[in-house]
Amino acid sequence: MNRRVAVYILVALTVLMLVDGKYGLFDTTAPYRHLVRIEEAKGAGLDPGTPSAEKSGLLEEMLGPGQVLRLNNALGHINVTGTPGAERAQLNYNIYVYAANEAVGEAYLDRLDIRVVQSETGLDVRLVEPAKRPEEVHQVRLDVSASIPSEARVEIYNNMGTVRVENVSGPSIINNAFGDTTIKEVGGKLNVDAAYTNLDVTRVRGDLVVKGSYGSSSLRNIDGNVTVESDFRTTSLTDVKGDIEAEISFGGIAANEIDGDIKTKGAYTIIGARNVTGSAIAHTEYGTVRFQGIGKDMIVDARRSDVTIILEQVPDHRISLETENGSLALQGTLSQLQPQTGEAGKKMVNAVVGAGTHSIEVRNVQGNVSVKHPPHP
């Protein structure tokens, strides 16, 4: 085994173990748990020590319904809360300078300022620094705690730090890295890019788009459609009213209580979907797929993966299963369906159970397929 292949396998096992342990979907990685230890990101790089100089202030500006508070920040913590009926934005800020000594810090602090530009679209807030930072100044941090009208929107671009946003309108945009990101109660569409973070989103009354690699995402109570793009990340979705479309690699996705359809594409991933009213589609390689309680059609196109489908309703399906160089098992009330053996190690089942209202289509190469319908008393 060459070194590159060994690295890929180790990374895949690491991510599968994290997903399996976090969501309890499967027990596929139990023999490997002693090999790797995983710790989630907790705001790396945000503790440079005691600041050499600091100052604080308060800014107040008019901000109307539908207007946007736009924050651009390199390093710091952002907290924005919407207040019903408010007409102004209030921003409490703290600037910290980390320097070689207090004198250098104080001198540089005097050259810093908060710039607020008001326009028809809203407010643009950012820290203004000299073009060149002295070598004796190590870091500058800006923390902002803001209260805005709940009918206003936000656009936050934060390179490093924790971000917390609650009770604002949409469409809103939140980009953050290297710090936990918590978002609650967004009255409209939300677009999030949160790399190297642990992301928690609750209650979005619109569509949700989530991008970002490394860390974890918890997405709950979403009224619209959800789009997920990530690498090396675990994502859980609960109570989604619309459709889900996810493209992931070296990670996993667990979806539960979904009113629409779910479509996933991934590699080196664990894909799990349970209690889905619509259809479920998965395209994957080097991973695991588990569908349970899917209301409509199920389609799986897999390579070197294990596929498990559990029917909770009375079977009423057109069933087409095929695996090459793997096992094919039908259990419970479906055990009377016997796989046929073909060329090149293929095993196949083609049958209609009930009226065939819905379909189950699975194609797998060098992987196992299991379809079961537990008998009910």
Annotated model-derived regions:
Residues 1-194, 198-377:
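Intrinsically disordered, low-complexity terminal regions
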